[in-house]
């Protein structure tokens, strides 16, 4: 039938839009299922109360069948869904390996697929799986947040505010912010200066002439940039 993909940075309202589209299908009499990943437990208070979708501003949606999995590479799942549901919603699609092929097969079998997902990492590197998904989607809805830096401009990017090199780190406002391009560049500049300061501090083990030489190099890079 079709694939609709909702993308945008964190805090841009992707889950709110996702819930809105699912609820419209419910009102139209469609049988709907939402798939969540086991890793996404940010707003689950306990194991007995996890079968819901929750937005960042704590709107809770339960008016739909919900299942948890971390593996979409099962033909049996698609066969079961085809028999029971008209609409399949996938929350936080970037968590799932194979989400593109899975969604494509569902759509080819006559189901509607609605996916909410980040399209890129905190380093502004696109998730390759989501790039493929966008290419085969009939509809792509790109949302923007409000910049948490200047609190004026629209935000199209997500930055991580804690030190971690993990590509995917589950979290909310405690670990991430949405920012505009200007604030993104300020953030990158701040991180660069922090790294350079660490390099200068690490030069205490070098000889005095070598330390002065390295310090001059770093200062020159700052001036040139």
From Swiss-Prot:
Q: Which residues bind substrate?
A: 122, 167-171
Protein residues bound to Zn(2+) = 147, 150, 180, 183
| Top-level taxon in the UniProt lineage | Viruses
One GO BP: DNA biosynthetic process
E.C. designation(s): 2.7.1.21
Please name one Pfam family that this protein belongs to: TK
Active site, renumbered = 92
Q: Where is the composition biased (Polar residues)?
A: 197-207
Question: Where, by residue number, does ATP bind?
Answer: 8-15
Enzyme class, broadest EC rank:
transferase
The answer to whether UniProt assigns keyword DNA repair to this entry is: no
Q: Where is this region: Disordered?
A: 197-225
**Gene3D superfamilies the UniProt entry points to:** 3.30.60.20, P-loop containing nucleotide triphosphate hydrolases
Reactions accelerated catalytically? thymidine + ATP = dTMP + ADP + H(+)
Q: Composition bias, kind Basic and acidic residues: at what positions?
A: 208-225
Which keywords label this protein? ATP-binding, DNA synthesis, Kinase, Metal-binding, Nucleotide-binding, Transferase, Zinc
Report whether Glycoprotein shows up as a keyword of the record: no
A GO MF annotation of the entry reads: thymidine kinase activity
Q: Which family does it belong to?
A: Belongs to the thymidine kinase family.
The protein's matches in PANTHER family, at most eight in alphabetical order, are given as: THYMIDINE KINASE (PTHR11441), THYMIDINE KINASE, CYTOSOLIC (PTHR11441:SF0)
This chain belongs to the protein called Thymidine kinase
Organism from which the protein derives: Acanthamoeba polyphaga mimivirus
| Gene designation per UniProt | TK
